[in-house]
Amino acid sequence: MIEPNLGAPLDIHRATVLPAWIDWNGHMNVGYYVVAFDKATDTLCRQFNVGWEYTRDKIGMTFVLEVHVTYEREVKEGDPLRITTQILDHDAKRVHYIHMMYHATEGYLAATNEIMLMNIDFASRRSAPWPEFALVPLTKLAGAHKGLPLPKQAGRIIGIKKK
């Protein structure tokens, strides 16, 4: 586990835009943004002890309930990515967070991914409270992020505004 700065969004995930991720428009295809964000979710889950080992050891797993992606600016093959994560809320079974994808060297915001993740009991495959070993670090992280400004992309809905 990386020791994060708890008073700021987690800055613990890096990636590079792979050639296979490029579409006919010459930029990263929309689906691969979600792939990159999913890898960042894996990194996040390890921060509160519910990574791959959690499922491998048949304790539990996490399921994504809902996602919302915004595309701010394109990235291209070979571009380095920096993905930060901010916890927006959590309860006994869920965590609500947002990933922010930046071009790692130019610094611009490329995309965001807001997610609701739920803890699942391995045996029953039903929702279950976070185990203590996950809830303690998750609560600490959420508390540290509570005072952070809410990103403007968080909580958005999709629709065409009527004039």
Model-inferred region functions:
Residues 15, 94-96, 114:
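Short, small/polar residue-rich loop motifs at catalytic or cofactor-binding pockets
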Residues 44-89, 93-95, 110:
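Hydrophobic beta-strand-centered segment that forms part of the acyl-chain substrate-binding groove
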Residues 111-113, 129:
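A structural microfeature
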Residues 105-107, 123:
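Solvent-exposed strand-loop boundary residues in beta-sheet-rich modules
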Residues 1-64, 118-163:
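Hot-dog-fold acyl-thioester-processing enzymes
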Residues 8, 108-110:
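Beta-strand initiation motifs
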Residues 69, 99-101, 115-117:
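Hydrophobic/aromatic beta-strand elements that line small-molecule binding cavities or substrate pockets
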